[in-house]
């Protein structure tokens, strides 16, 4: 008996799968996917099966202490919500600026060297740091559940 489907599908593919499962009466199953299903379009899949879950390395701005003020200021300035993951871009600009200042150069190689040694201030998520290979240190993955048409955080890998 299948209880969980682990998927690498995109949202539109996952929705088609959920609709097909409902059509054949196989709804006592949960779908687990990645951030490719953690979209607003997936809200159409709420209630088609017992559960829909997604993991994502992109935590929402509202999940950070300073996230709500960022969202309020952005909404006031641009009259719409930021793009998915936009707070990471916002924070990255602060870190990049600090790296350019530390490198005292606009040379990409010097900036890259500086980025690998920086503990950069990031206004929304706190800090951004990278290892010698360029991988972000201390990143977190969120586990989300689709409930009532909205994605709700269930747990974070940095707080198991």
Predicted regions: what they are:
Residues 1-160:
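Extracytosolic ligand-binding ectodomains
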């Amino acid at each position: 008996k299948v209880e969980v489907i682990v998927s690498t599908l995109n949202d539109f593919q996952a929705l088609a799968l959920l609709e097909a499962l409902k059509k054949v009466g196989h709804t006592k199953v949960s779908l687990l996917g990645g951030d490719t299903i953690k979209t607003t379009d997936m809200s159409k899949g709420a209630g088609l099966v017992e559960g829909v879950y997604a993991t994502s390395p992109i935590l929402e701005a509202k999940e950070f202490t300073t996230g709500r003020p960022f969202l309020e200021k952005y909404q006031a300035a641009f009259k719409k919500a930021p793009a998915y993951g936009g707070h990471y871009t916002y924070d990255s600009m602060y870190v990049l600026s600090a790296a350019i200042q530390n490198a005292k150069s606009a040379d990409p190689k010097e900036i890259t060297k500086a980025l690998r040694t920086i503990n950069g201030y990031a206004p929304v998520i706190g800090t951004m740091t990278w290892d010698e290979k360029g991988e972000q240190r201390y990143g977190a993955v969120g586990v989300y559940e689709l409930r009532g048409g909205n994605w709700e955080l269930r747990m974070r890998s940095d707080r198991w």
